[in-house]
């Protein structure tokens, strides 16, 4: 039987091309599926344990007596306690309990959680399978920085009232960064690099040794290490170690180009000392500690004030200072209604906001203070001292209940760990080391 000529005919060029295109399409689809699958497997988001809340955190009410500077509270009534499982290295912990939207934001080894100030219950949490490196809050967001493949450079922004995810940023960072923040910006820094962000984690400034930078000459001191940094409003102050010589660099916090710092003054501080660090910053001033002396500089480089701590009533400096090597020297600073303060194991020092001129000193302070109406609460050895906010006179001392003292007993031999206070409404938060106790201020 004769076969049709078409049966033995070779495939046409068009048929061959179509077959090849189909094979290529299948291979491409498989490759895309594999890439998506690997991205999902390797994604940090897949390794997140998180909850959110829609419930209102409520509002904090303050007793009218808080505005009477001579009114003395009767007692501190314990209401709840909680623990932080995070490391308490002196350069990574906050100078005060982090309170935002009527919630306490608590650091954990691998995450954060929000605690209701009303009853101490958890409102939301965010946890990952990598260690938490730094925690701060600013511009209405919680910023949690985790360790990633390139050091402690993976930062997530969360809404403090709900735990809602806002943004993520990845950077190259060391394994031991410190948080730096103001009411305008937040960021992290280590001995080599500093960056500031907006609330959406868009970077507004980078400073220091920029990894693989195509324009290294934009940085004023890429060869220098960073000792400490503070920021307020539109000022960023950085103390550098340049081959054993200290330099104070005062610059714009949000320059026109984030890669190019706008330096306003670059001040020679002399030889680097073991205690060299920023201790306070104003809108256009910065105070630097070195060799047991504090010098205050204006943004134009003028020195305004010099104070020898040995001539004050503050306690002598500890024999061992900044023993953690290249770790950032983040000071314990807090703001009061009429002053800025700095605490160290020497005691508490207060500065005038406009000039940073030293204005008061309390050697008996065991940590950072907090305002309550027309009062200031200050931790002391036998409890919490209550001050008239205008005169700064101590009008009385509130003893801490025994339960709170036993909670803090494990940290009694660590004077470098301050007792840190925060007040919201009529709730006083007392934190030392890993413990946080909440008390109702009873009048």
Language model features: what each stretch is:
Residues 1-16, 31:
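Intrinsically disordered, low-complexity acidic/proline-rich regions
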Residues 2, 21, 25, 29-64, ...:
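Repeat-blade elements of multi-bladed beta-propeller folds
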Residues 2-3, 16-25, 38-103, 110-111, ...:
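Aromatic (tryptophan-biased) beta-strands that constitute blades/sheets of beta-rich domains
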Residues 117, 160, 199, 253-255, ...:
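Inter-blade boundary loops/turns of WD-repeat beta-propellers
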Residues 155-159, 247-256:
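Beta-propeller blade signature
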Residues 164-195, 202-226:
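Asp-box/WD-like beta-propeller blade repeats and closely related beta-sheet repeat scaffolds
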Residues 213, 218-219, 225-231, 251, ...:
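C-terminal, beta-strand-rich globular interaction domains
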Residues 216-218, 311-313, 319:
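Surface-exposed beta-loop interaction hotspot
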């Amino acid at each position: 039987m004769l076969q049709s000529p078409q049966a033995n005919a070779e495939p046409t060029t068009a048929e061959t091309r179509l077959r090849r295109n189909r094979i290529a399409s299948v291979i491409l689809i498989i490759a895309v599926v594999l890439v998506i699958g690997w991205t999902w497997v390797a994604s940090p988001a897949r390794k997140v344990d998180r909850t959110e809340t829609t419930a209102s955190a409520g509002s904090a009410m303050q007793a009218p007596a808080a505005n009477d500077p001579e009114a003395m509270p009767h007692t501190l009534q314990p209401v709840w306690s909680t623990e932080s499982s995070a490391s308490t290295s002196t350069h990574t912990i906050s100078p005060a309990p982090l309170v935002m939207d009527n919630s306490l934001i608590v650091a954990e080894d691998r995450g954060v959680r929000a605690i209701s100030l009303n009853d101490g219950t958890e409102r939301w949490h965010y946890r990952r399978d990598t260690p938490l490196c730094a925690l701060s809050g600013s511009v209405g967001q919680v910023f949690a920085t985790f360790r990633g493949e390139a050091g402690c450079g993976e930062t997530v922004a969360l809404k403090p009232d709900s735990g809602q995810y806002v943004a993520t940023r990845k950077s190259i960072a060391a394994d031991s960064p410190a948080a730096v923040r103001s009411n305008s910006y937040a960021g992290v820094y280590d001995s080599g690099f500093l960056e500031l962000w907006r609330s959406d984690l868009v970077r507004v400034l980078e400073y220091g040794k920029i990894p693989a930078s195509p324009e290294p000459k934009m940085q004023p001191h890429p060869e220098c290490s960073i000792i400490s940094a503070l920021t307020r409003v539109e000022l960023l102050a950085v103390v550098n170690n340049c081959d054993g010589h200290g330099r104070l660099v005062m610059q714009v916090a949000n320059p026109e180009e984030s890669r190019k710092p706008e330096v306003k003054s670059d001040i020679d501080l002399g030889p680097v000392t073991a205690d060299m660090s920023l201790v306070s910053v104003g809108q256009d001033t910065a105070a630097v500690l070195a060799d047991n002396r504090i010098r205050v500089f204006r943004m134009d480089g003028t020195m305004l004030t010099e104070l020898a701590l040995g001539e004050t009533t503050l306690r002598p400096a500890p024999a061992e200072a900044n023993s953690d090597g290249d770790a950032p020297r983040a000071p314990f600073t807090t703001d009061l209604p009429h002053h800025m303060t700095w605490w160290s194991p020497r005691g508490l020092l207060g500065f005038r906001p406009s000039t940073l001129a030293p204005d008061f000193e309390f050697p008996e302070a065991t940590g950072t203070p907090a305002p309550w109406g027309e009062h200031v609460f200050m931790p002391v050895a036998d409890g919490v001292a209550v001050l008239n906010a205008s005169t700064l006179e101590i009008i009385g001392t509130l003893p801490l209940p025994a339960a709170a003292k036993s909670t803090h007993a494990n940290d009694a031999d660590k004077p470098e760990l301050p007792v840190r206070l925060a007040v919201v409404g009529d709730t006083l938060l007392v934190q030392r080391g890993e413990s946080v106790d909440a008390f109702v201020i009873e009048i």
